[in-house]
């Protein structure tokens, strides 16, 4: 029973560290303990923090023997330092989120974040005596593992305000008129459209001469030529939909 | 190449309207006749002469005409050669209601402080401004700007004094943290074509050559949510504004309503409002609850919509069509 509980801690810690690394890599703006550092160091610290978490997650899953001790010790140190940093951050800036899961951790640091951090520290310490790796435990998993894992996931979920934030974001994503998009992404969507293929023979060059944004629409203007006649072809591509509405227009230059 | 780009930007509104409908890009309103800017040529108790890009013009002063030059003042305190902005009585465009002389403003992030001199970065597309805080204004400036240190926000209205701005009236209450430590704005999940907030002003010509440069009377807005991938460019230093403003590019037109006077105008986006994007303040002029700067109007547009430049702001509603 005790070993089953230790196995489950390995999986939970691996999943938490991977999620933490992933969310920090997606949103690299400095949050949580990173704001205790001088400004130039915050972003590199966030990237390094994500890399360390990913490395420890891999170590917990695959290392056994002496290497496993080192990885589990490092994981415990990471959570211990994290807990101290959260307490310090809470004193300095009570409105600040913990940044544990990147941009999802927006709720001010409270008893839930601190309890969760303490729980993970205890989980890391509990794995010290285990001889095998997380992967080996996974291969030989029993129904008891499943029950304990589900119970611990439920506890962690109760202690995680990020879940609510994630649900809110999934249900109501950033409205299209506020969403930042890259030019490359919009050009790709334009090239995949029927309008592009219809107007393509008219274009003098595939590079737009002007691009601009109007709320939910991204516009690209191309130089067009047919014989001696010169004109412009303008495309409007909708932002935010997987299959965007694309409109096009051939515009003659204004009469002199 | 630059002329090409200007031409393309000029065409954007027409092309947007052609593809999304006329309500997406309404025609901008022309400069109103009752707001005039130029260089003062002469002033007497009853007449005021102004050199404007359209030529010499003369206006009538009445006992009700008020004057501002760093504060309420008498007409005899104005001198020929000063940059002067007039608001005339609507319907009687030769009769002056109020006169502002050498208006100037410093809005942005403090980059250096040397005694009573503050250097302010006003955005990636504008030159930095040097503001000098005279002793008589230092008390009220300190109340609203407790941290005159690099990295903190600064916004003050004053008068132009050569290449510097004499900062006399604070135009914001400075946040207690530097710009880089501004709390992250929570992601917006709701939006609307109509956004409430506050409108401030900037001077596109910085008080220079107002007798010859028509941009002194430019009617437009510097927009704090200019599209980063296009016009804002690689040096873009705008922040995500705290009001949910739709992303736009130069050449778009927006409808701006002064909620204090209920006067409105359709204005083109003519510049990036990078400095304004950092401010999430409120305007005390007519006590509206909305916060965040949604538009930085050109000085002429701000006054044309009924604003008092010395108060720095008014509550505004901004509408973008065709979203």
What label would you give each PLM region?
Chain B
Residues 45, 55, 64-66, 115, ...:
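Disulfide-stabilized cysteine-rich extracellular repeat microdomains
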Residues 54, 124-126, 262:
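Glycine-centered tight beta-turn/hairpin loop motif at sheet-sheet or coil-to-beta transitions
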Residues 51, 121-123, 255-259:
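A generic structural motif
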Residues 32-33, 95-107:
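Short domain-boundary/entry signatures in modular proteins, especially
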Residues 45-50, 115-121:
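Short aromatic-glycine-enriched beta-strand elements
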Residues 24, 58-76, 94-95, 127-146:
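A cross-kingdom feature marking solvent-exposed beta-strand/loop segments within repeated
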Residues 1-28, 34-37, 42, 77-88, ...:
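Secreted/periplasmic proteins
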Residues 48, 93-96, 118, 163-165:
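Hydrophobic residues embedded in beta-strands of well-ordered beta-sheets
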């Amino acid at each position: 029973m005790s070993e089953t509980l230790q196995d489950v801690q390995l999986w939970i810690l691996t999943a938490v560290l991977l999620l933490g690394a992933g969310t920090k890599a997606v949103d690299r703006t400095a949050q949580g303990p990173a704001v205790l550092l001088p400004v130039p160091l915050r972003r590199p610290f966030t990237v390094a923090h994500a890399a360390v978490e990913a490395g420890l997650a891999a170590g917990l899953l695959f290392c056994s023997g002496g290497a496993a001790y080192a990885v589990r010790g490092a994981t415990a140190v990471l959570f211990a330092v994290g807990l101290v940093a959260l307490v310090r951050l809470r004193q300095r800036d009570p409105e600040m989120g913990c940044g544990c899961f990147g941009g999802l951790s927006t709720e001010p640091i409270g008893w839930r974040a601190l309890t969760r951090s303490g729980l993970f520290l205890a989980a890391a310490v509990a794995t010290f005596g285990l001889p095998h790796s997380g992967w080996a435990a996974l291969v030989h998993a029993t129904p008891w593992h499943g029950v304990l894992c589900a119970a611990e996931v439920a506890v962690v979920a109760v202690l995680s305000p990020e879940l609510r934030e994630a649900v809110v974001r999934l249900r109501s994503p950033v409205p299209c008129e506020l969403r930042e998009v890259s030019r490359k992404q919009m050009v790709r969507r334009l090239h995949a459209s029927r309008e592009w293929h219809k107007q393509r023979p008219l274009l003098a060059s595939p590079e737009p001469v002007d691009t601009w944004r109007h709320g939910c629409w991204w516009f690209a203007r191309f130089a067009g030529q047919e014989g001696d006649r010169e004109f412009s072809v303008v495309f409007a591509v909708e932002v935010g939909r997987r299959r965007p509405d694309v409109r096009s227009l051939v515009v003659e230059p204004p009469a002199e | 190449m630059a002329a090409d780009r200007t031409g393309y930007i000029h065409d954007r509104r027409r092309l947007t309207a052609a593809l999304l409908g006329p309500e997406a890009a309404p025609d901008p309103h022309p400069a109103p006749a009752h707001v005039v800017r130029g260089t003062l040529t002469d002033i007497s108790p009853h007449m005021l002469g102004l050199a404007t890009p359209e030529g010499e013009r003369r206006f009538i002063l009445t006992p009700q005409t008020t004057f501002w030059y760093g504060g309420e003042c008498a007409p005899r305190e104005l001198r020929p050669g000063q940059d002067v902005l007039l608001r005339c009585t609507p319907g009687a465009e030769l009769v002056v209601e109020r006169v502002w002389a050498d208006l100037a403003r410093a809005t942005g992030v403090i980059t250096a402080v040397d005694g009573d001199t503050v250097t302010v970065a006003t955005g990636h597309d504008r030159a930095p401004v040097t503001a000098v805080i005279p002793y008589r204004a230092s008390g009220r400036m300190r109340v609203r700007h407790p941290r005159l240190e690099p990295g903190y926000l600064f916004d003050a209205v004053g008068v132009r004094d050569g290449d510097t701005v004499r900062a006399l009236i604070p135009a914001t209450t400075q946040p207690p943290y530097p710009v880089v430590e501004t709390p992250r704005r929570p992601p917006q999940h709701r939006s609307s074509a109509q956004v409430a907030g506050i409108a401030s002003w900037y001077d596109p010509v910085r008080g220079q050559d107002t007798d010859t440069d028509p941009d002194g009377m430019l009617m437009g807005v510097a927009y704090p949510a200019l599209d980063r991938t296009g016009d804002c460019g690689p040096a873009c230093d705008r922040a995500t504004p705290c009001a949910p403003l739709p992303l736009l590019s130069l050449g778009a037109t927006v409808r701006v309503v002064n909620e204090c006077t209920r006067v409105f105008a359709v204005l083109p986006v003519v510049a990036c409002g990078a400095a304004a994007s950092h401010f999430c303040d409120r305007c005390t002029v007519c006590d509206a609850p909305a916060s965040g700067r949604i538009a930085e109007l050109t000085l002429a547009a701000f006054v044309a919509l009924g604003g008092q430049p010395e108060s720095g702001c008014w509550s505004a509603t901004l509408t973008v069509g065709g979203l």
